[in-house]
Amino acid sequence: CNTWLADNYSGLGIDDYSRIYLTSFDIDKHKKARRKNACFLYEKLSEIANFLFPIEKMDCPLFVPIVINKDRDSVHKRLIENEIFCPIHWSHPNANCKSNLYDTELSLVCDQRYDLNDMERIVDVLSKLLFEKV
């Protein structure tokens, strides 16, 4: 694999469009938006959600992984029906595994494309789903 990468990608540089985009990209603005969204999710869902990781001072999360203890796949489906996409990042491996994380993890997207109104909607819909029979 490394040999193939070295043979096919050596000496390639970034294209002009990407260089211009990256130099004009406001990294701090996006980091702040992500942290603000993630902290909002943690604050509003702290009573009803099991978070996999705490938010650390330097984190810039793309998503907040939570554990859904009731039928995660049904909750996931209902979120999609409400036009809220939450990826499942750790799907079942082919091998036998004793961890139930593969059946319970759901990622709440909180990147810079979203604002607090979007986060509030995620919280509202998810809260209703977790307290009803899915």
Which functions belong to the PLM regions below?
Residues 1-134:
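PLP-dependent aminotransferase class I/II
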